[in-house]
C-alpha cells in the first residue's frame, strides 16, 4: 500500500531515521618554509603513524565557524594564524554508538602569524600525538581524509593565483 499523501500524525518507529547533526570548523594554516608553502598538520591521538589531518573541532554554542577554526588551530597546533578566506564545507555521515551523525565541517584558509608548531596548551595535549609542517603541494596526497585532501588542494589553488 502506498504512503498516503495527507499528513501522517503517527509514523511507526521502524520508519523513523534519527540523525544527529554536528557542526565543526577547521583550518588550513599555510606558511613558507625554505621558499615553499607548507601547511600545519596533526596526527590525532590514537591514530596510527602517518595519519595526518587538519586541526578542527566542534563549534561552541554562539561561536562563529571562523572563530572556532582559529581556536582549534591554536589548541591543536600551538600556532597563531590570520584569516584569509573560507575554503568550503565538507559533509559526511558517520555512525557513533549506533547513531547516525550528519556532520558539516567548515574549513578556512589561514596564514601563519606566530608560534611554534607543537607548542600545544597542556589542556589539549591529550588530543594530538604529533604535529608537522607538510609541503602544501604534497598535502592532497598525505592527508588521511578525502574532504581534507580536497581543502588542501583548494588552498594550493588559491595561493597559486
Listing of model-derived features with the role each one plays in the protein:
Residues 59-150:
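Unchanged
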Amino acid at each position: 500500500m502506498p504512503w498516503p499523501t495527507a499528513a501522517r500524525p503517527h509514523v511507526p518507529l521502524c520508519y523513523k531515521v534519527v540523525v544527529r547533526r554536528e557542526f565543526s570548523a577547521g583550518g588550513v594554516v599555510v606558511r613558507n618554509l625554505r621558499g615553499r608553502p607548507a601547511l600545519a598538520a596533526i596526527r590525532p591521538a590514537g591514530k596510527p603513524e602517518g595519519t595526518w589531518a587538519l586541526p578542527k573541532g566542534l563549534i561552541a554554542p554562539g561561536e562563529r565557524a571562523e572563530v572556532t577554526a582559529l581556536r582549534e588551530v591554536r589548541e591543536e597546533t600551538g600556532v597563531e594564524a590570520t584569516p584569509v578566506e573560507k575554503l568550503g564545507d565538507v559533509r559526511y555521515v558517520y555512525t557513533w554508538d549506533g547513531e547516525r551523525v550528519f556532520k558539516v565541517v567548515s574549513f578556512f584558509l589561514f596564514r601563519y602569524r606566530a608560534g611554534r608548531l607543537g607548542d600545544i596548551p597542556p589542556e589539549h595535549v591529550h588530543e594530538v600525538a604529533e604535529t608537522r609542517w607538510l609541503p602544501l603541494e604534497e598535502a592532497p596526497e598525505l592527508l588521511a581524509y578525502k574532504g581534507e585532501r580536497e581543502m588542501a588542494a583548494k588552498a594550493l589553488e588559491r595561493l597559486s593565483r
